[in-house]
Design a protein with these regions (language model features):
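N-terminal glycine-rich anion-binding loops that anchor highly charged ligand groups
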Residues: 35-49
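Long, charge-dense
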Residues: 96-140
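Charged, compositionally biased N-terminal leader segments and the immediate start
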Residues: 1-38
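C-terminal functional extensions of proteins
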Residues: 169, 179-227
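A short, well-structured juxtamembrane/interface segment
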Residues: 58-75
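Long, charge-patterned amphipathic alpha-helical coiled-coil/hairpin "stalk" segments used as oligomerization
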Residues: 120, 126-184
Length: 227
């Protein structure tokens, strides 16, 4: 009988921290010389680590001020609006608090399951995500918007930004799918608002979460450098 591979691992065990470090070493090695600023690479490598696919690197786009805007917003304890409860569950409160101790779970909002949102969606036959983001105006104005699911919601926040209704601190635009996805991202990156997107149809909640966590890492590192 062939020995299970777990025995080889147990013969030379690695902790979770060691495995993560080794993973990032592999990502850095395969990437070669950096062609983007170090802070942007911190975000991209975290995304690669999340999905295991280095080919996504050229698809990630940053507005010129995206990293600094995101770091500043996190340090100030800006509220977050997320377009799915999966993102809300995936965000680490401990990581957010490592940047700003004032963060609480109540500062991460998702309205897709709100009864009034569901009722309006049923009445109009429009997606819940559309009404959910409209309900979040107060959070979005000055807050961090994290989209990993709903392109229609991103289209609506794009409209609100373009028409001067809100001015988010940062918009992370990673909706995934085939309908209204690519154009929602292209429109976002053209707007005068700090943003991070992933071109094309790919994206998703886990990648959106990884961007927030990477920004927390950047914020911690720069605090140590300047502290």
């Amino acid at each position: 009988m062939t020995q299970s591979l777990i025995h080889k691992f147990l013969a030379k065990p690695m902790s979770g921290v060691e495995i993560e470090k080794r993973s990032f070493d592999i990502i850095d090695s395969e990437a070669g010389p950096l062609t983007v600023p170090r802070d942007q690479w911190e975000v991209i490598r975290r995304m690669i680590h999340t999905c295991g696919d280095p080919s996504i690197a050229p698809l990630v786009r940053f507005s010129p001020d995206a990293i600094q805007a995101g770091v500043s917003a996190l340090r100030a304890g800006a509220p977050l609006y997320v377009d799915s409860n999966m993102i809300r569950s995936g965000l680490s409160l401990a990581r957010l608090r490592s940047v700003c101790p004032a963060y609480t779970s109540a500062m991460i909002t998702c309205n897709v399951a709100a009864p009034d949102v569901a009722a309006e969606s049923s009445r109009t036959s429009l997606p819940r995500s559309y009404f959910a983001v409209r309900k979040a105006r107060a959070t979005l104005d000055g807050g961090i918007a994290v989209f990993g699911n709903a392109p229609v919601a991103l289209l609506e926040i794009n409209r609100m930004i373009a028409e001067g209704e809100i001015k988010p601190a940062l918009v992370i635009g990673l909706p995934v799918g085939f309908v209204h996805v690519e154009e929602s991202k292209t429109e976002l990156i053209s707007l005068p608002v700090p943003s991070i997107i992933m071109m094309g149809r790919r994206g998703g909640s886990t990648l959106a979460v990884s961007i927030v966590h990477a920004l927390c890492t950047v914020a911690e590192c720069t605090q140590e450098t300047t502290g």
